[in-house]
């Protein structure tokens, strides 16, 4: 398996898990891009637990065309569905 295929699989796993959590009632609390990767924090409204997902920034950007959001406004983040 070449490197490109590995990266595509990593991106798919990251997005699949994030979307599954959103579908299960988790809400996007904060998502930001760092120098070494992407952190996606999902906040569960029922019990307050946070789940953190991450993927390398360059891999995720190749897939999403740089639609990585950075916001502290939870209401605004909840409305964003540009995955």
Stretch-by-stretch model annotation:
Residues 1-83:
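Terminus-proximal functional modules
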């Amino acid at each position: 398996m070449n490197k490109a295929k590995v990266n595509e699989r990593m991106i798919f796993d990251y997005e699949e898990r994030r979307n599954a959590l959103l579908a299960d009632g988790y809400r996007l609390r904060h998502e930001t891009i760092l120098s070494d990767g992407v952190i996606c924090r999902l906040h569960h409204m029922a019990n307050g637990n946070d789940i953190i997902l991450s993927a390398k920034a360059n891999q995720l950007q190749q897939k999403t065309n740089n639609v990585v959001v950075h916001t502290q406004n939870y209401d605004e983040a909840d409305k964003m569905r540009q995955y």
